[in-house]
């Protein structure tokens, strides 16, 4: 399997619960390296631009409002099959449907406040990583 990079965001609900370290431990325990990381409080403009693909969807305003409601932790994960591995760690979008032991099953409250975001494909990951991290700020190790 190829070495990949994927974007991960720990959303405001999980940051507020003080579980960043527990989530990072899961990434590292699965063999993923954190090669870039920063905390940010997204502006409305940044959240709208990042989630622009969902602009026509009925949940867009609520998603943006939620993502700007508090700080988020944004990281780039690197490793073999990182995109799928991270999606497996996250679990289903709806925490009620997420498998026991996944990040969303353990830390999310609802389909809206679902603890984490992860890129869904290589093309998306490249765009999302570039959105938050200029290449010079990502370090393979």
Curated annotation (Swiss-Prot):
Checking InterPro entries in the record gives:
NDK-like_dom, NDK-like_dom_sf, Nucleoside_diP_kinase
| EC numbers, comma separated | 2.7.4.6
Q: Name one Pfam family in it.
A: NDK
A biological process from GO: CTP biosynthetic process
Cofactor(s) required for function per UniProt: Mg(2+)
Q: Which reaction does it catalyse?
A: a 2'-deoxyribonucleoside 5'-diphosphate + ATP = a 2'-deoxyribonucleoside 5'-triphosphate + ADP; a ribonucleoside 5'-diphosphate + ATP = a ribonucleoside 5'-triphosphate + ADP
TM spans (from-to): none
User: Family, per the entry?
Assistant: Belongs to the NDK family.
The free-text function statement in the UniProt record for this protein reads: Major role in the synthesis of nucleoside triphosphates other than ATP. The ATP gamma phosphate is transferred to the NDP beta phosphate via a ping-pong mechanism, using a phosphorylated active-site intermediate.
Know the name of this protein? Nucleoside diphosphate kinase
